[in-house]
């Protein structure tokens, strides 16, 4: 009997040891000269926390190994490989700024392979059990309730009141509101202190400037800033409350409803951005509601919902410049969700959104003298690769390549200014920031990319490392990027303030503001809570939910995740590594996209079945489906 127990538990015990060892490496590479004294820098497996982690892993593996062997599948294996690679790369780049932890000396390759195995085991096991949760009885019992109109209104009001309670302390502490660089730049553009351009959405710039001017007319600039904060906050609260309402309609269990309300009301990123004059809070709220209507129109089509989708779609496009890159593909994919009778409406919505967007950006903007945004904003990846190349191989550049680079960027300072996790210092050297329409630029860009490609052929590894170093935190939840310059915007930018001469200042005591700053930073560093504000968490959640739908062979539902996937891809070419502000829309979407998983697990009839959609199409043209957005 004892022999059987030993044989049965031998594999999980060894697996737990390998995983514990993998988590004990610091990320520093070990070369051939590493002495025993320096091993503590490379490996730290002693201490209470390491012992506790090993005991916990041992219990989990021994208890869950049989179930893991029974339910594991190839989809989980693939995801586990992706997650493990992300963790390894994140560890290496966070610690060293390169991939030496993976591909250093020969010994190091063996160490990294062992770490990969340890990470793989826990990821594979975790994914397998995560996908089993919806099949469990307690989960099924929580689903499938019948919605009631009174309760629906109650949840809408509860969400609204909770957000008012959770956000108001931030707004009061930083009265009249923080104005970070991005927000102040928009105000400066409106007031004529800077050229009128579309670096930030110009329509939103006009709205912000109009509210500022109205407040100044009524009282003072402080009141104008407060007016922007209050108007934007009111819209955001309404959007998020409507999302909770949709969740209730979809028969989401109460724990998802409560969790979503708590997320929106009390996770500090929401309150922290509510008090700031910046586009991100408004954009995130609008695209979150857009995604809710998008899912709802898949559940049950109606003309009214198509109108809501159009209005929200164009709002997304006008609150962030890359919004069109999320909205248009999602509307094209909507065509495949609906049966023939409804597809024409998806096509009409897509055409109307695109036509309105072109009318605003290509018609109204030039007529009003709005200059287009600089093209350098889209070139973070190649600019970072060039700068890293010059840092690593400054002598391996030909005269013609140097000339081509220098026409576009300041060649002499690129290597010095290069920040592996933030492309802004390199982009600032772009020579055509204020003259993007110069006819010479197109020719210069062709020469630059010829040089860029020639250098890539000589040292491709540098380019790969530059990209990995600028993106690892989007793939690894456990290492926050170092290029963020502060996650929250608790300041009034003095540089932009001087340009327009706007007299704005905080009215609250600095001690209270310090408490809120400290609270936000502690939240980010707290075990468990910090993962809520880690960009990599939402890349993983997106892949987990998509993987579950693949296992269930619900291929059409995977298309619903077009918006999160496109947002993640945009993050990967963004200027900052692991910035949660860029991943914020995916955060808000993921915490109610779980309703799709619930719908799949509960076995409820849903509109992803064509017959159900067809039934709603027939009835929607006669009856009004829903009267609230």
Q: What residue ranges belong to the model's regions?
A:
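Transmembrane-helix signature of polytopic, membrane-embedded enzymes
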Residues: 156-158, 240-266, 284-285
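Extracytoplasmic catalytic/substrate-binding loops of multi-pass membrane glycan-assembly enzymes
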Residues: 174-188, 195-211, 218-223, 585
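Membrane-interface alpha helices of multi-pass inner-membrane proteins
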Residues: 306-320, 352-357
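Short acidic/glycine- and proline-prone juxtamembrane loop motifs at membrane-interface regions
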Residues: 272-282, 319
């Amino acid at each position: 009997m004892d022999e059987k127990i030993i044989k049965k538990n031998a594999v999980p015990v060894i697996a737990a040891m390998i995983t514990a060892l993998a988590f004990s490496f610091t990320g520093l590479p070990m070369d051939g000269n590493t002495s025993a004294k320096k091993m503590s820098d490379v490996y730290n497996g002693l201490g209470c926390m390491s012992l506790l982690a090993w005991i916990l892993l041992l219990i989990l593996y021994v208890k869950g190994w049989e179930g893991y062997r029974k339910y594991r599948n190839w989809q989980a294996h693939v995801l586990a490989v992706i997650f493990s690679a992300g963790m390894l790369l994140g560890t290496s780049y966070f610690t060293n700024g390169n991939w030496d932890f993976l591909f250093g000396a020969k010994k190091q390759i063996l160490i990294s392979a062992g770490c990969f195995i340890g990470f793989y085991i826990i990821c594979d096991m975790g994914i397998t059990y995560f996908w089993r949760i919806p099949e469990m009885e307690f989960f099924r019992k929580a689903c499938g309730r019948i919605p009631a109109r009174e309760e629906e209104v109650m949840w809408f009001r509860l969400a609204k009141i909770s957000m008012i309670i959770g956000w108001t302390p931030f707004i009061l502490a930083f009265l009249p509101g923080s104005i970070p660089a991005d927000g102040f730049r928009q105000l400066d553009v409106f007031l004529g202190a800077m050229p009128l351009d579309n670096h930030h959405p110009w329509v939103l710039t006009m709205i912000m400037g109009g509210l500022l001017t109205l407040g100044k007319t009524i009282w003072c600039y402080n009141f104008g800033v407060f007016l922007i904060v209050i108007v934007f906050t009111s819209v955001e609260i309404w959007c998020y409350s409507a999302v909770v309402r949709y969740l209730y309609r979809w028969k989401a269990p109460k724990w998802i409803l409560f969790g979503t309300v708590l997320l929106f009301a009390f996770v500090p990123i929401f309150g922290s951005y509510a008090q700031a004059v910046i586009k991100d809070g408004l954009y995130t709220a609008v695209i979150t509601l857009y995604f809710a209507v998008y899912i709802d129109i898949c559940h049950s089509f109606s003309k009214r919902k198509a109108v809501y989708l159009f209005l929200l779609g164009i709002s997304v496009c006008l609150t962030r410049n890359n919004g069109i890159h999320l909205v248009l593909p999602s509307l094209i994919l909507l065509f495949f969700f609906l049966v023939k009778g409804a597809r024409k409406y998806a096509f009409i919505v897509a055409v109307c959104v695109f036509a309105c967007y072109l009318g605003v950006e290509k018609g109204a903007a030039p007529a009003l003298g709005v200059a287009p945004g600089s093209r350098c904003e889209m070139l973070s990846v190649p600019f970072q690769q060039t700068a890293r190349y010059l840092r690593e191989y400054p002598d391996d550049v030909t005269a013609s390549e140097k000339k081509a680079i220098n026409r576009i960027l300041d060649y002499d300072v690129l290597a010095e200014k290069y920040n592996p996790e933030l492309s802004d210092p390199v982009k600032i050297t772009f020579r055509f920031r204020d003259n993007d329409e110069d006819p010479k630029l197109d020719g210069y860009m062709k020469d630059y990319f010829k040089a860029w490609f020639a250098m890539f052929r000589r040292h491709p590894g540098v380019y790969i490392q530059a990209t990995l170093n600028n993106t690892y935190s989007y793939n690894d939840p456990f290492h926050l990027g170092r290029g963020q310059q502060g996650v929250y915007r608790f300041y009034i930018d003095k540089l932009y303030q001087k340009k327009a001469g706007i007299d704005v200042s905080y009215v609250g005591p600095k001690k209270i503001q310090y408490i809120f700053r400290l609270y936000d930073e502690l939240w980010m560093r707290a075990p468990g809570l910090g993962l809520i504000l880690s960009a990599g968490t939402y890349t993983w959640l997106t892949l987990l939910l998509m993987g579950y739908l693949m296992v269930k062979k619900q291929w059409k539902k995977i298309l619903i995740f077009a918006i999160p996937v496109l947002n993640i891809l945009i993050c990967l070419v963004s200027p900052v590594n692991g910035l949660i502000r860029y991943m914020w829309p995916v955060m808000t979407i993921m915490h109610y996209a779980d309703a799709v998983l619930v719908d799949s697990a509960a076995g409820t009839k849903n509109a992803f079945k064509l017959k159900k959609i067809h039934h709603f199409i027939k009835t929607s043209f006669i009856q009004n489906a829903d009267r609230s957005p």
